[in-house]
Swiss-Prot record:
GO terms for cellular component: nucleus. Its main location: nucleus. Regulates senescence either by modulating WRKY53 or by activating SAG12. Affects the natural variation of cyst nematodes sex ratio and susceptibility to parasitic nematodes, depending on single nucleotide polymorphism (SNPs) between cultivars. It is found in: Nucleus. Residues 16-41 have a biased composition (Basic and acidic residues). The gene is S40-3. InterPro entries: Senescence_reg_S40. This is Protein S40-3. Belongs to the senescence regulator S40 family.
């Protein structure tokens, strides 16, 4: 007659704990030294915040993530120029903007 075992008896048997405990106690010094070397080498993991993920729902449909990212990127951009204006050029551009917005009359 064969003996039936419970799953916990096979996986969590007392022998496996004693074997692991013996290995750890014998190699305790080597284990600690390896962990400190590994800590120095490894870099921290960046975990993104959950608040940055936002989905907009229109008529029950979900917006694809690439569309959301594109919207964020374009909304965050400002108009800028690569060249810096100085002196007379800066005055001309300032006056042009003020005329276009109605703050300066022609």
């Amino acid at each position: 007659m064969s003996e039936e075992f419970q799953e916990s008896e096979v996986i969590f048997s007392d022998e496996s704990f004693t074997r692991k405990d013996n290995k750890i106690s014998h190699n305790n010094e080597n284990y600690e030294r390896k962990s400190t070397e590994k800590d120095k080498i490894s870099s921290p993991v960046r975990i993104p915040s959950r608040t940055t993920i936002r989905y907009t729902e229109e008529e029950g449909e979900m917006t694809p993530p690439h569309v959301i990212i594109e919207k964020r990127r374009t909304e965050a951009q400002m108009a800028f120029s690569f060249c810096t204006l100085k002196g007379r050029d800066l005055s001309r551009h300032r006056n042009t903007v003020l005329r276009m917005t109605g703050f300066l009359e022609v």
